[in-house]
């Protein structure tokens, strides 16, 4: 068996490069982060052949002295960290001192830098991790780093690189993330001399978000700003009218650092539940701010993942920030009549008459539910929020006309029913309003059911005989921790030994529901986020299903008085844009558009 020996420094750096330098985009990320840590206000990036032939990053930061320039290529040499206490509260983008030596070990590397404007600078060159050579160079204050022929000395790594166009796309995405985090810094990205991205320092947050999300997103952006405990959430999200097929359009930053975090992304997705069609994902740019000692950034080679001291706290802050925006944003809350008592329940009969006991219970609860009283005026859009240290101002496009006036649905003139599925109405000015009768009634019932769950401790309907439910061990522990919340929701559940629980009662509205499957789902949510506040949201799918079964169906006759009651009911709830499954409730066709289509204009 070979004897253990210490590896030579060059090989050590190449091994480190395997973790830090995944592709050209990794080089761009590390070099730009160094520029930002150096106080740069302008960063220029040039790449050729997707960054494999050349990556050049130039900045106007503080620059380095001759001694520091040479020391920067030593492993674990850094100006950003001094002791273990500093590691627990990292405020800079970089801190390990690994990136430059790792990059220099797998490329032809050149660093030009100057700490002052006197033109006296230093050049350091390294080829494939060899011995550095240095000398003077004339240049202005700042630093320029060139990385040529990436992976030229590690052909096994080079052959796994994608086509130049693919690598260029990864580089662009890396720069977009960095530009989103620092609107106070100007960024320029060129590929083979062609301008790919240009963003001036001090650009509006919405403009940079639109660069990342697409120009069409600009008119859908609404600011988010909310605090909960030690966590503050700021940023911009798009309305459900601008959603994506994947989750890649959701940019999450923690203390200014772009991260990938499943729990945080799930919190945002859960807040959007019921507003997006199946398979669609929210888009936005969100910044989570919390004390530095509450987050560990030293858990991933590329610092793309973090570990929170209290993940539940972050999850709840994100969820409530987004959910609060969804309740008040003008593109979702169409207003309600202020100061008046909500109208009575809609007297629509589900298919087959009164329906099951479950449906009857749903309708009974809906009759008891009350929407919150109006404030007497349309809920205003969130105010623009000054960015932290003046670096991120949430300027958004004019939203005039996006919010419907209070009492909008009650003001409609009911015309009739089309295809026994759609309610046709006329709005002021001759606009044709088409309302999906099932989606709208489903939303109305769902909102009232959810209001009952949120505002009251529901009475327990005792069972004649307890039902024993056995769950997987980890799930059972999560359920055990959530028993107080389950009691508030009307469940009488007690431990029954091992991983079993005795269910002695449940809310009357859950008659006929598979309790084991329901408790398994609730436990899974508790296990995921460790938060009792998520239990109500975990019931979303169940409540949506119950409302769906109780609502009037498509291809069902609706009497004029029933249609009128439904319209009045929609004005009594604070959300009516989409059904709980994400389908639109209402569609408008302005008179001018109708006349244009028939040739009158």
UniProtKB/Swiss-Prot annotation:
GO terms for biological process: mismatch repair. Gene3D superfamilies: 3.30.230.10, Histidine kinase-like ATPase, C-terminal domain, MutL, C-terminal domain, dimerisation subdomain, MutL, C-terminal domain, regulatory subdomain. PROSITE patterns: DNA_MISMATCH_REPAIR_1. Residues 119-140 are annotated as: Disordered. One of its GO terms (cellular component) is mismatch repair complex. Keywords: DNA damage, DNA repair. Transmembrane segments: none annotated. It holds the Pfam family DNA_mis_repair. GO terms for molecular function: ATP binding; ATP hydrolysis activity; ATP-dependent DNA damage sensor activity; mismatched DNA binding. This protein is involved in the repair of mismatches in DNA. It is required for dam-dependent methyl-directed DNA mismatch repair. May act as a 'molecular matchmaker', a protein that promotes the formation of a stable complex between two or more DNA-binding proteins in an ATP-dependent manner without itself being part of a final effector complex. Belongs to the DNA mismatch repair MutL/HexB family. This is DNA mismatch repair protein MutL. The lineage of its organism: Bacteria, Pseudomonadati, Myxococcota, Myxococcia, Myxococcales.
